[in-house]
Design a protein with these regions (language model features):
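The conserved phosphate-sensing helix
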Residues: 257-273
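A short, basic N-terminal segment
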Residues: 1-90, 274
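Walker A/P-loop nucleotide-binding motif
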Residues: 88-110, 124-125
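Conserved NTP-binding/hydrolysis module of P-loop NTPases
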Residues: 130-146
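Conserved small helical "lid"/interfacial subdomain of P-loop NTPases
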Residues: 224-250
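Conserved AAA+ ATPase "SRH/arginine-finger" region at the nucleotide-binding site
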Residues: 121-125, 204-209, 220-232
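Conserved P-loop NTPase "ATPase switch" module shared by AAA+ and STAND
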Residues: 156-178, 182-188, 192-193
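Sensor-1/coupling segment of RecA-like P-loop NTPase cores
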Residues: 95-100, 185-212
Length: 274
């Protein structure tokens, strides 16, 4: 099968246009079209090498075993779910915090998947109090116009008595004023709230000198998920991802390479199966 036939087969199978292939190999659409028609007058060897590399990459990606990050019900994850359930049932403010890559977000999303009464918001670095309220208004299908006090009142009116749970991920990115808005929503609407993020979230809630006592006093439970996975958690996730990890030596190697970090473990597992 010549290179043009192979290329057409890949394009038909995966739905690639000539334009997409041209961009992927760093050549113009015109040059790509001319080559396919057998009219290309440029460096044919270079063109065919680029196309061959493109075909190889597509096939490698197709043949690779796809390993997606997914929730695994480890002891720590179950503790996280218990904290979420407590915040939801008792309408309290709770916090999950720990280093990056330990599964906080997956635990939050798993709880949200199980219960459609959850409002899940992932904060971004540019979030302000107003941005947070506008995002919440959007989820509640409320008008986003008005000042912050108006938006708070709209959200409170919509949330009061609903028994919903507001989850804020990456909450360490929120400024103090946004954290105060969350406190007011909790106080006035009587809903449960869970904030999750890096360890500095606790500092942000307390204040560097403890000046935010009124804010942190609302926190009923704060679960420290640590700086690395417990070995029991790690081994369970490793075996769930890779049957080969039943071997203790393989688990030890994975643990050493990933430093007990779930996110690094997922990346290692993907690399193993490529």
């Amino acid at each position: 099968m010549n290179i043009i036939t192979q290329l057409k087969d890949v394009m038909d199978t995966h739905g690639y246009s000539q334009g997409q292939v041209a961009r992927a190999i760093g050549r113009s659409v015109t040059a790509m079209n001319q080559y396919v028609q057998g009219k290309y007058n440029g460096d044919i060897a270079d063109m065919e090498e680029r196309i061959a590399n493109f075909i190889r990459r597509v096939r490698e990606k197709q043949n690779a075993l796809r390993i997606d990050e997914r929730f695994v019900s480890t002891p720590t994850a179950r503790k996280g779910l218990e904290v979420l359930a407590y915040a939801h049932q008792e309408c309290e403010i709770c916090v999950l915090y720990g280093a990056a890559g330990l599964g906080k977000t997956m635990t939050l999303k798993e709880y949200a998947r199980r219960d459609d009464a959850v409002i899940f918001i992932e904060a971004d670095p540019g979030y302000t109090a107003r941005t947070l309220l506008e995002e919440l208004c959007g989820r509640l299908k409320q008008n986003k116009n008005g000042n912050i006090h108006t938006l708070i009142d709209l959200c409170v009116e919509k949330l009061k008595g609903t028994g919903r749970l507001l989850i804020i991920d990456e909450a360490e990115l929120l400024p103090y004023r946004a954290l105060e808005v969350i406190r007011r929503l909790h106080d006035k609407a009587g809903i449960g709230v869970v904030m999750a993020g890096m360890p500095r979230l606790i500092t942000n809630l307390k204040g560097k000198r403890g000046e935010f006592a009124q804010l942190y006093s609302r926190v009923a439970l704060a679960l420290d998920m640590g700086n690395a996975l417990d070995r029991e958690d790690f081994d369970q996730i490793a075996v769930d991802l890779m049957p080969e990890a039943e071997d203790q030596k393989i688990r030890n190697a994975l643990y050493d390479q990933s430093k007990g970090n779930a996110r690094r473990l997922f990346k290692l597992a993907r690399g193993v199966y490529r």
